[in-house]
Amino acid sequence: MKMKNTANRDTAWYGARTASLAEFMTPERNEVLRRTVAMRTRYMTVLAENMFHGQNAAALIRHCEAFGIQEMHTVETLCRFDPNPDIARGTDQWVDVRRHSSTAGALAALRRDGYRIVATTPHREDVTPETFDVTRGPFALVFGTEHAGISDEVIAGADEFLRIPMCGMVESLNAVSYTHLTLPTN
């Protein structure tokens, strides 16, 4: 699934600041930084609801950084979002993490910012990555806890559901695997 970067409000702001760093890095590294900043997006974001395992939290941040997502959100009602630094490998320095103390607060903040709420679940018939319409406006992909998936509160508040079609015996995928398969690319 390809997606054009249509909502990077920060390109000029970041561009001016990265230009001031040019004299301190090689031209090649400066080009990587310039290209990376130009591709950052806030058109899509991720909400991780009560992610228990530090390795999954770190892998989620790495996925967000790799796919150009500038900001992700976390709900921390059951546990703190605490990425394992050995797995994050510094990518947490490039992604803004917004922490919320409740699911209701997170969903309200995302709606206030103009996002539609897209819950990931294997149990609902709605859209697949191939049929998901990224052009309908900014969206937040919601991933649930490793233990129970998304909460009833997310199910009740979602605008649509995104599922990965599966035909094996397993009922669900690891949150990070699901992230990898559902995030559109710029």
Name what the model sees in each region.
Residues 4, 8-14, 18-125, 131:
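RNA substrate-binding interface of SAM-dependent RNA methyltransferases
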Residues 179-185:
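Conserved small/polar residues in nucleotide/adenosyl-binding loops
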Residues 60, 154, 179:
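Aromatic/hydrophobic pocket-lining residues that form π-stacking "cages" and hydrophobic walls in ligand
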Residues 167-177:
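Short glycine/threonine-rich catalytic loop with a Thr-x-Gly-x-Asp
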Residues 55-56, 127, 149, 173:
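Residues that form or flank phosphate/diphosphate-binding pockets in enzymes
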Residues 123-166:
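Active-site/ligand-binding-proximal alpha/beta "capping" segment
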Residues 117, 142, 178:
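A residue-level signal for conserved active-site and pocket-lining positions in enzyme catalytic cores
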